[in-house]
Amino acid sequence: SRGLGDVYKRQVQISREKFIRKVREEFEKAGIDYTEEKVREVAEMRVRDEIKNGVQMIQYQVITLMTTNGQAPFVTVFMYLDEVPEGRTRDDLALVTEEVLKQRIQGVKNEKGVWITPAFPKLIYVLEEDNIREGSKYWELTKLAAQCTAKRMVPDYISEKIMKKLKDGNCYPCMGCRSFLTVYKDENDKPKFYGRFNQGVVTLNLVDVACSSGKDVDKFWKILDERLDLCKRALMCRHYRLKGTPSDVAPILWQNGALARLKKGETIDKLLYGGYSTISLGYAGLCECTRYMKGVSHTQPGGTEFALEVMHYLTDTCKKWAEETNIDFSLYGTPLESTTYKFALSLIHI
C-alpha cells in the first residue's frame, strides 16, 4: 500500500515550477506578450494534464505490466489529506485524489472496449475534519468519493478520529488489500508503517469448530484450543521458512529500500522479530459459527456476547503467542475468497 501524500507531497509542485519556466520560455521565443498570471494559468492546465496522465498510467500499469499469472498485484492507494502539511501541498494532494476518483468512476476498458471496474489498485479514503461536513474545505471531494463508491464499490473509508483512538494516535493504510499492521516505532521512536511486511497468514475455520462441537459450548472451547494450537504450528512453519533468508534473493526488497536496506549476504532475520513484521491468525465464519451455536446472528442479542467472547479469546491468544516468541502475531478477518469453497467442501464431511 502507498499513501498518495507520501508519494506526491513534492512532485506536483516540482512539475508546476517546471511548467512555469517552460511556458515563460515558449512565450518569449514566440515573441508573445505575457503576464505572470497568464503563465501560471497555462502552467496549471499542464499540471492537471500531467496528473491525469500519471494517474491513468499507474492504473493501467497495475492491471497490465505488473500482473503475475494473470492476477494484478494487491495494491492499495491511500487517500489521506492530513498526511501532508496544510496549504498548497494539501491542495495538490486533493487534485491528485480527485483525479484518482474520477478515473475510477470511469473505469477501465477491457479487451472488448467495455468500461469495467478494476479490482486493483484498491482505494481507501480517509474521513477527517476538513472533508466530512457540508461546507468544509474538501467536502466536494468526499461527495465525489461517495459517487465513486456507489458506482464502483470503492473507495473503502477510514475514520481518522476512530482509527487514531484505536492505533495510538496513528492513521495508516492496510498492507496489500486488507491486512493492517500493528503499531511499530523505529529507533528514533517514530511510528513506521510503509515498508513493513507480513510473514504469512493461516486461517481458522470457526464454522468447523462449531459444527465439530455439536452445539456443546464446553466442547467448542476445547476444540477451539486444539485448532489454535494447529494454527500456531502452521504459522511457525511459515516463519521458519523465512528465517535465514539472505537479502540477496530479492535485492530490491531487502537491500534497496522497498522493505529494508540490509547488507549483501545479510539475512532478513532481524526483521522477523520485535514487531517490524507481523504474522497473522486469520478467522472466518464468525456469523455462521454464532448462528450454529446460539441460533441467532452475531449481530443479535444472545449472539453478540458469544461472538465477542470468541474474538476476545482469539485476540488474547495472539498476544500470548507474541509474548512467547517475540513475533508480532495479529488477528485478521480473512477475505476467504477462493478458500470459501475449500472450507465448504470440508464441512460436508463433518
Language model features with spans:
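Conserved catalytic cores of very large enzyme subunits
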Residues: 1-275, 292, 296-348
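Conserved phosphate/anionic-ligand binding catalytic regions in large, soluble enzymes, centered on
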Residues: 275-289
